Amino acid sequence: MTAKSVMVLGTTSNAGKSWLTTALCRYYARQGLKVAPYKSQNMSNNARVVVGGEIGSAQYFQALAARAVPDVRMNPLLLKPEKDTQSQVVLMGQVNAELSRMEWRGRSLSVWPVVARALDELLAENDVVVIEGAGSPAEINLKSCDIVNMRVALHANAACLLVTDIDRGGAFAHLYGTWAMLDKTEQQLIRGFVLNKFRGDASLLAPGPQMLQELTGVPTVATLPMWWQHGLPEEDGVFDDRSTAAGAVTQTVAVIAYPRISNLDEFQPLKNVPGVRLKWVRSPSELAGLGPADWVILPGSKATSADLAWLRAQGLDQAIAAHAGRGGAVLGICGGLQMLGEALIDPHGIDGNGPGLGLLPVVTVFDEAKTVQHRQAAFASVGGPWAGLSGVEVQGYEIHHGQTARHSAMAAAGDIACPVMPDGLAWQNAAGNVLGLYLHGMFEDPRVLQALFGAATPTLESVFDGLADYIGQHFEPGVLQSLIA
């Protein structure tokens, strides 16, 4: 079996590559074809656990849309930013310390055989491989070390779509400029232009698409209307004022947006809960007005100690403590759990030592070994605003360094943290309003949403099918089939 390959390129970051790739995966899978996604290199702190290690969340969801088992080959190189100039390198699912220390140009050249082999294997095993590029293929300063855009397209002989965000303005210039900066052999792979996030009367675009085709020979094959609530998380995006489901707002969920936040995509299901508003918080003023029914969430972090220092510098530590002191609900997930404790102890120099926020009487000791695994566990008796979780069994995943345990001195004094999941996976304070857990993905479990909100949200299957229906409606007739002919 030698697969046909379709590749989604973008004129910029956030043009719409990830969701369009996901939509194409489901579109072709619904035809009974064996489909796999692929992105050679992804830079994101949003990761998922699969057999063999971890991959970017976008490729994980794309695999589910393709009705395929997520596989490390679908995202063979994952870069997880730790600092502005430093990333942890995950190669074929596993952290590679040597590559993490390398200069990026040399690293890119050294890993090309690995990422190319992963693609070749997927091409050999499937009918269709839907490939996602990164950023723009016209970054001429990066082209000599490209392992994610046109080098991949040429290797796979992919039929390429070039998508642009028309809502930003300058869409035709973006499309023409990107196309013009490609080599002639690369230009020949571009099969269609896609105008994404369009608002208004599509007839007003004329004569733009026609003139663009005269200049390039490439037709505009789709104009996709703006669609805020397609149901997929932005790969590295944030919530905004549109992050409220239908109905009056009855509860606010405030997520602390520290610089190295990770796995933010796990909060996507909350955007669809009626009456719930999600918002990012970067300053104490944004927590003003929260009531006891409102939540503050400390999400995962790729640099727990550094993000905790940032949180303190903003004054958010005092604002969070004040909310908890009023009986307000506080939830920490993974790195957020570690921050909520009394102390972070780092004997191996992994993340840094320091005091925690002191809202849970627990202590975290960082390990050299990284825990990366799926977990299924049930909550024990849980109190406070989380009482609905009592006895609920949830599926999720762990990605972290470190283990958390009771603070022995505080326990001796009577301030006891209550373990509410086996193996130290989750802890609750005596008052019941502060909960911390290592398990990512809790809100993606319908049982959790039902227990906490009495609400059901759209299933992933319905989201994927909606995406496929959407592109089937808005692409020019026959285009999507011609890409795999």
Curated annotation (Swiss-Prot):
Any GO molecular function: ABC-type vitamin B12 transporter activity
Top-rank taxon, per record: Bacteria
Any coiled-coil regions, as ranges: none
Annotated function: Catalyzes amidations at positions B, D, E, and G on adenosylcobyrinic A,C-diamide. NH(2) groups are provided by glutamine, and one molecule of ATP is hydrogenolyzed for each amidation.
One example of a Gene Ontology biological process annotation: cobalamin biosynthetic process
UniProt-listed Pfam families: CbiA, GATase_3
Pathway given in the UniProt record: Cofactor biosynthesis; adenosylcobalamin biosynthesis
Gene giving rise to this polypeptide: cobQ
Protein name from the UniProt record: Cobyric acid synthase
Ranges of residues in domain GATase cobBQ-type: 250-448
InterPro entries in alphabetical order: Class_I_gatase-like, CobQ/CobB/MinD/ParA_Nub-bd_dom, CobQ_GATase1, CobQ_N, CobQ_synth, GATase_3, P-loop_NTPase
Family classification: Belongs to the CobB/CobQ family. CobQ subfamily.
Provenance organism: Polaromonas naphthalenivorans (strain CJ2)
Active site: 334, 440
Keywords attached to this entry: Cobalamin biosynthesis, Glutamine amidotransferase
